[in-house]
Amino acid sequence: MTPDRSPSLAETPAAAAEAVLAPQPLPVNTATADDHPRAVVRLLNIGHALDHLFILIFATAVGSIAAEFGFARWEDLMPYGVGAFFLFGLGSVPAGRLGDLWGRRPMMLVFFFGLGVAALVTSLAQGPWQLAAGLTLIGAFAAIYHPVGIPMLVQRARQPGAVIGLNGLAGNLGVAGAALLTGFLVQWLGWRAAFVVPGLASIACGVAFARLCPPQGEPPGRSRKPPAVVLPRALLMRALTVMTAAAVTGSLLFNFTTNGNTQFMVERFAGVIEDPALIGLLLAAVYAVASLAQVVVGRLIDRVPLKRLYLGIILAQIPWLLLAAVGQGWWLFVALTGAMVCIFGAIPFTDAMIVKYVDDRVRSRVAGMRLAVSFGISSAAVWLLGPVVKASGFTTLFLLMAGIALCTAAVVLWLPSDRAVREAAAGGER
């Protein structure tokens, strides 16, 4: 008889991961759809939108901020935003542990209120280093959402793939909102308002979440429920490695594009469209269309073998990125839309792998470890974006991204197939 066991704060990440990877398909939870009130589900999805919006305000407003702070080129100010992306990744580890062991509801309250206050503080910056400090604070609170909010959302989901897809749509509508809302706020009220308005909205969401989300009971990490059947060690390590490596390369593409697309479109639409607000509207349209891909992919994940679907979407990124590298004007708009559809469409897969293989008791911690590595490394994209574009131009950047997509495809080929997982579960470790 296996004794009951409650994970302790001293439990190592490796031990936690090895104890919970399970060979089942995306699980179907027996809880009813009413376990999370609809208002709570909406607020969790809004939280994802706010998370991505906040982390990209700076990239959208960088031209205006650079001019006020006396920088001749926007590229020279971009490295000051790297702290936000670094903590966006590194902060996922403590956020995930606290989510499992303290509780996901209280951590989401810290997320909403902390993000709002950090944005208000950033709006007061009087120079580049104060701005960098404020952005880093935003990154620290933004780190909470992915390892806490998404596991909380799928904890009781009957169709996890569909839930992840819809949540991904919400997150990337936040990306679109960063392009659209920030563009209009910068033009009409100044860049400081681009931080103040979403900051107040986040605080309001925190108040609503505190009132509408009921207590969640015992934190998942302290549950005495026996762990699921584990994968053999070889497949376990393959799944973890692929999950992390693919997340790194995917995050690099996401950061390069979402942080650089505004200035990219300004450059490639020169002489066609000069209005920054209209550029922001076009970019928001690109992101809105691309976000719909996550809903479609999320539903397909529940029906199609994960490896085959993932590989197809990654391979589709390459030709679109190559076309965007050489496109101009409206042809560029078409190519960029295709590229972003495929980049956004690949996002649900790492979360789907966590739901598929990882027991809920440590799901936030495993997600936090994965995010710390992927976001931590991919934060280099923010630091490199300005210097690379300044030295070599956007054409070189998009060719580099096509190469990164090719690397992702090579990594995904190593992902265990559903058949291999089933056979391993039936026959033990090979």
Residue ranges and their predicted role:
Residues F58-A59, R238-L292:
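Extracytoplasmic gate region of multi-pass secondary transporters
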Residues A61-G89, E274-L281:
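Extracellular/periplasmic helix-loop-helix junction of adjacent transmembrane segments
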Residues V82-G96, A284-V296:
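Central cavity-lining transmembrane alpha-helices of secondary-active solute carriers
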Residues L90-Q126, I301-V304:
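Conserved MFS/SLC helix-loop-helix module at the cytosolic interface between two early adjacent transmembrane helices
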Residues G134-N172:
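Cytoplasmic helix-loop-helix junction between adjacent transmembrane helices
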Residues N167-P214:
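Helix-loop-helix hairpin linking two adjacent transmembrane segments in secondary transporters
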Residues I301-T350:
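C-terminal transmembrane helical hairpin of 12-TM major facilitator-type secondary transporters
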Residues Y357, R361-F394:
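A late C-terminal transmembrane helix in Major Facilitator Superfamily
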